[in-house]
Curated annotation (Swiss-Prot):
PROSITE patterns: RIBOSOMAL_L27. It comes from Acidovorax ebreus (strain TPSY) (Diaphorobacter sp. (strain TPSY)). Keywords: Ribonucleoprotein, Ribosomal protein. Residues 1-10 have a biased composition (Gly residues). Pfam families: Ribosomal_L27. GO terms for cellular component: cytosolic large ribosomal subunit. GO terms for biological process: translation. Residues 1-20 are annotated as: Disordered. GO terms for molecular function: structural constituent of ribosome. This is Large ribosomal subunit protein bL27.
Length: 85
């Protein structure tokens, strides 16, 4: 005979791993070509000069240089550019 009641079950026993999003290289930093500048969901920050966009909207440097953040256009879209060093 069981000495304890059954534990039952739950539907909540899992969690997703963190996605590590955010800015990886800040303004003024010297980075190399291919370095990730921003990991994001959607284009919260738009690519500027010498910056490429990955299929998951990750922004990365196309050339070696210094990172600079700014705004562009009438709606003040946030942009990131790389100035060649």
């Amino acid at each position: 005979m069981a000495q304890k009641k059954g534990g039952g079950s739950t539907r909540n026993g899992r969690d997703s791993k963190p996605k590590m999003l955010g800015v990886k290289a800040y303004g003024g930093e010297l980075i190399s070509a291919g370095s990730i500048i921003v990991r994001q969901r959607g284009t919260r920050i738009h690519p500027g000069v010498n910056v490429g966009v990955g299929k998951d909207h990750t922004l990365f440097a196309l050339v070696d240089g210094h990172v600079s953040f700014g705004t562009k256009g009438a709606l003040s879209k946030h942009t990131v550019s790389v100035t060649p060093a």
